[in-house]
């Protein structure tokens, strides 16, 4: 947990799965390493300010504490289950999480 | 040639006009495309409010979908195309050209029933007045065959003959109606356009220009203080915004906090113009220079034309010089390389500025 004290996103590899973790107030969040918009690597484009995560690529934002979308964001973040035990962060990475990058509302469109 | 869609087969580029139908749940709009013209440029010419940011294959904002073998990919290795799902026919509007009459599915959030009043156009233009203003930095003028009405902060896409793709350049001047556009360009190793500019050879061949484009613009009726954080040639669009703000006497009522960064002091340019602006309303205008390499600066003996010089990156200097609440309620314009943009964006977000009040073009 000490590694998260400085704020921002930190990259970890858990059982071969890359995740990003951050701590906001008393909430720890663990997410896939990509923006749900266009798969931008958030370790480069993600900016944490207060409880807000911003992807600088197209300025999508989320509140990391409440998990709510903000501003231009059109898709929610997904989170790995995690918990703190004796000062260590435990992440349930039994299944790799990923985003569906297709435009859902276009899939049923009749050409 | 690479064609979007599942099957790649040899196809012949269209040699005549093609009819492209942009469609989604909001409607269908037919647009005639010139041979080889990008879908984005054709759509914008028609007044469609298509999604885009850079217009040059970099940002990936203009994703749409086409049917197999209908669209030629003008730049298969475009950085903005890295995440495209070819199996679903995804393409970049700015890098796709119709091979035949075809349909293009655009994101559902685009309202195809609306047409914009501001429609960019394509011009054959002449390049003039190249001046080297700093090491590896030059200014130049593009003369159009007719006048345009750009908004300050906008850019043009340009392509000299023989160059494959368009590149985006922000205007440094602002005139409500003009046929002379001024630009700044940085020398890029291996760059075709900058190579021509810095070659010293006569520039007598016309170039293709498309514009005006861009959404990182300034509304002269805006009543907010301005924050400008820029590095190197990223100052271009900000010079246009400052020119218009000065013209409407914005700084008699509102403040300007600006940091202009370069690696070394000899790399700055436009200093006479900035110093002149700073003198118009010294109580309201702060313009600082940030030097990221070399000896520490910051004492007044290092001032250049009355502009204070500080050592550090733009965001560091902006942070150290800003007072509490400096950015509250302001409107920010950023320009420069991606790492600088990200650092400045982080600074402003930390300061509580909403992203809707931070404007910049994503050219890189």
Where are these regions (language model features)?
Chain B
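Reductase modules of NAD(P)H-dependent flavoproteins
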Residues: 2-96, 101-102, 259-364
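Short, surface-exposed secondary-structure boundary micro-motifs
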Residues: 67-70, 107-109, 161, 212
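Fe-S ferredoxin-like electron-transfer domains
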Residues: 81, 88-141
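Ferredoxin-reductase
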Residues: 115-205, 224, 262-263, 290-294
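Short, conserved phosphate/pyrophosphate- and ester-handling motifs at nucleotide-, phospho-/glycolipid
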Residues: 153, 234, 337
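A short, basic/flexible loop-to-alpha-helix module at the beginning of a structural domain
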Residues: 211-222
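Histidine-anchored nucleotide/phosphate-binding helix
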Residues: 237-249
């Amino acid at each position: 947990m000490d590694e998260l004290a400085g704020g921002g996103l930190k990259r970890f590899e858990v059982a071969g799965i890359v995740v990003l973790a951050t701590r906001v107030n008393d909430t720890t969040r663990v997410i896939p390493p990509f923006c749900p918009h266009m798969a931008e690597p958030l370790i480069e484009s993600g900016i944490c300010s207060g409880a807000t995560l911003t992807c600088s690529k197209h300025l999508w934002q989320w509140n990391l504490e409440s998990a709510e979308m903000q501003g231009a964001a059109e898709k929610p973040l997904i989170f790995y289950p995690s918990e703190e035990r004796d000062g260590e962060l435990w992440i349930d990475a039994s299944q790799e999480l990923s985003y569906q990058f297709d435009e859902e509302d276009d899939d049923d469109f009749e050409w | 040639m690479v064609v979007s869609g599942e099957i790649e087969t040899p196809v012949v580029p269209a040699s005549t006009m093609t009819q492209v139908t942009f469609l989604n749940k909001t409607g269908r709009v037919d647009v005639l495309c010139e041979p080889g013209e990008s879908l984005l440029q054709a759509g914008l010419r028609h007044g469609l409010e298509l999604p885009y940011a850079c217009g040059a294959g970099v940002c990936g904002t203009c994703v749409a979908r086409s049917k197999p073998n209908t669209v030629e990919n003008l730049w298969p290795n475009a950085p903005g195309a890295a995440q495209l799902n070819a199996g679903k026919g995804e393409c970049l509007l700015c890098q796709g050209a119709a091979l035949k009459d075809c349909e293009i599915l655009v994101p559902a959030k685009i309202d195809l029933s609306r047409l914009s009043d501001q429609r960019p156009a394509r011009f054959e233009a002449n390049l003039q007045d190249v001046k080297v203003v700093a090491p590896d930095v030059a200014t130049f003028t593009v003369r159009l065959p007719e006048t345009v009405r750009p908004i300050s902060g906008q850019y043009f896409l340009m392509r000299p003959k023989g160059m494959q793709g368009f590149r985006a350049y922000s205007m440094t001047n602002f005139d409500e109606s003009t046929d002379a556009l001024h630009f700044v360009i940085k020398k890029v190793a291996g760059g075709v356009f900058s190579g021509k500019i810095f070659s010293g050879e006569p520039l007598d061949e016309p170039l293709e220009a498309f514009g005006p484009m861009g959404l990182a613009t300034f509304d002269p009726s805006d009543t907010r203080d301005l924050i400008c954080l820029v590095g190197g040639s990223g100052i271009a669009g900000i010079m246009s915004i400052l020119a218009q703000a000065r013209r409407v006497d914005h700084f008699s009522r509102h403040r300007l906090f600006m940091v202009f960064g370069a690696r070394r002091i000899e790399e700055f340019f436009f200093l006479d113009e900035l110093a002149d602006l700073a003198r118009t309303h010294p109580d309201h205008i702060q313009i600082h220079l940030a030097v990221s390499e070399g000896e520490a600066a910051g004492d007044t003996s290092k001032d250049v034309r009355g502009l204070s010089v500080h050592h550090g990156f733009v965001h560091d200097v902006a942070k150290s010089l800003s007072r509490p609440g400096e950015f509250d309620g302001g409107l920010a314009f950023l320009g420069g390389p991606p790492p600088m943009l990200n650092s400045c964006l982080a600074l402003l977000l930390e300061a509580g500025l909403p992203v809707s009040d931070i404007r910049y073009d994503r050219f890189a």
